[in-house]
């Protein structure tokens, strides 16, 4: 009852980030250390239960504002009284994709059913703020056969007061924390944006409202993730975008009609992402160009197969033995009657049965590997050097026989290939 998570006990190790010893700082634990422990557990549990065809219906990728970008501000309100507020808007997190359907955009926090996104008018009535917009953000949901839910962005200026004083408090801004699963891409990262001395007053005089902070002129200021006591004046524009949700499965397997609908109706996918990530070519009338899409996807599959494999990768061949198990949507275990007795259980592609190596080894060594900059993981991922020193990369593992995307991973450049699946003999 209640899903797999209720049957899991967390036994944290003292002295670690999620079980800190005194006098370590723990003020952000509820929205950061807790979430960075809890949400990856969803993916672990999902991979554990995928082999069961009934239980896989409960699989859900990471979402729900996987790292909360807090905006804390204070000052004197429109009535001359002191005020303080924590912007609660990121509670409208994105729900991750499922094994058989898309995630839910701004669906709330997946760990609780009682999330309520604040009403903008009520916030403006209570505090000295004027919202320029609050919107769901295109491309913020992780790409996949089933797309992750979109997150949102809130943008405001002071109103009825000369200035307000801010603190930022966040993580998850350099690399995605809402990772996808079984070939799905991650969702957007947290993003703080701040335009000093903008032309927002001139825009108001022309009866113009910006649809995005990028349309506002001014001087861009990069905010730190623990920046304290910075002032926002009436001409300064502030926005915060929170994490999107992870996608499920290979984006090239998504129905092109759904991708076209995401572009034209849902405003969930940009034309550029549709082509570059989903391999879908849009026609001038807003529909999918079927022939061009088929040609592009075929080309992308061919390019995937050309990437190098590991030094110890098995010979390129298809297995004809019995299918024993399917641990993920893209990976299965087959018998190889020609192999030595202790090597007969082999990883293979679920589509073409290409041999990916012994189940005693990491299947990723048998895949074609492409290592990309972290910015390739989601269109909203920016320059990591703003926040961290080690270079993160986006690794993709393809079937060398058919080009199917088996899995993605985010790691530091020098990290060994991550082991995400082991079978108990």
What are these regions (language model features)?
Residues 1-317:
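Glycine/proline-enriched, intrinsically flexible loops and inter-domain linkers
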Residues 310-332, 363-384:
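Short, charged low-complexity linear segments at domain edges
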Residues 354-392, 412-413, 418-419:
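Short recognition patches in nucleic-acid-associated and regulatory proteins
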Residues 344-363, 394-398, 406:
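Short, structured motif recognition centered on aromatic/hydrophobic residues
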Residues 15, 245, 353-354, 413:
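Conserved beta-strand elements of beta-rich interaction domains across eukaryotes
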Residues 324-348, 386-393:
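Short, flexible, mixed-charge glycine/proline-rich loop motifs
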Residues 191-200, 204-208, 381-401:
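A short, charged
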Residues 390-425:
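Short, compact, well-ordered microdomains
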């Amino acid at each position: 009852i209640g899903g797999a998570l209720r049957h899991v006990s967390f036994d944290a190790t003292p002295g670690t980030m999620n079980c800190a010893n005194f006098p370590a700082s723990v003020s952000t634990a509820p929205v950061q250390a807790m979430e960075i422990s809890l949400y990856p557990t969803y993916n672990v549990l999902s991979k554990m239960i995928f082999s069961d065809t009934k239980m896989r219906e409960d699989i859900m990728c990471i979402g729900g504002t996987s790292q909360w970008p807090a905006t804390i501000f204070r000052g004197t309100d429109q009535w001359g009284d002191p005020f303080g507020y924590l912007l609660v808007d990121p509670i409208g997190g994105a729900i991750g994709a499922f094994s058989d359907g898309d995630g839910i955009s701004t669906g709330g926090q997946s760990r609780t059913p009682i999330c309520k996104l604040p009403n903008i008018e009520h916030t403006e009535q209570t505090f000295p703020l004027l919202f320029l917009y609050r919107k769901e953000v295109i491309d913020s949901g992780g790409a996949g056969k089933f797309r992750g839910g979109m997150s949102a962005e809130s943008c405001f200026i002071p109103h009825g007061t000369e200035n307000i004083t801010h603190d930022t408090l966040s993580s998850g801004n350099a690399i995605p924390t809402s990772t996808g699963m079984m070939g799905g891409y991650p969702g957007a990262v947290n993003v703080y944006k701040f335009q000093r001395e903008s032309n927002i007053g001139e825009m108001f005089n022309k009866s113009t409202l910006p649809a995005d902070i990028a349309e506002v002129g001014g001087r861009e200021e990069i905010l730190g993730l623990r920046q304290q006591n910075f002032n926002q004046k009436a001409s300064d524009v502030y926005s915060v975008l929170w994490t999107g949700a992870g996608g499920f499965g290979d984006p090239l397997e998504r129905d092109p009609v759904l991708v076209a609908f995401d572009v034209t109706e849902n405003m969930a996918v940009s034309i550029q992402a549709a082509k570059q990530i989903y391999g879908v070519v849009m026609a001038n009338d807003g529909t999918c160009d079927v022939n061009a899409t088929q040609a592009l996807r075929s080309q992308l599959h061919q390019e995937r197969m050309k990437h190098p494999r590991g030094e110890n990768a098995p010979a390129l061949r298809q297995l004809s033995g019995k299918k024993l198990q399917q641990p993920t949507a893209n990976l299965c275990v087959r018998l190889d009657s020609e192999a030595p007795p202790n090597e007969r259980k082999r990883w293979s592609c679920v589509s073409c049965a290409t041999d990916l190596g012994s189940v005693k080894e990491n299947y990723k060594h048998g895949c074609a590997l492409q290592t990309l900059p972290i910015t390739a993981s989601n269109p909203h991922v920016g320059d990591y050097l703003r926040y961290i020193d080690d270079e993160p990369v986006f690794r993709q593992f393809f079937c060398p026989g058919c080009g199917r995307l088996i899995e993605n991973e985010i790691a530091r450049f020098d990290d060994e290939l991550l082991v995400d699946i082991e079978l108990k003999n």
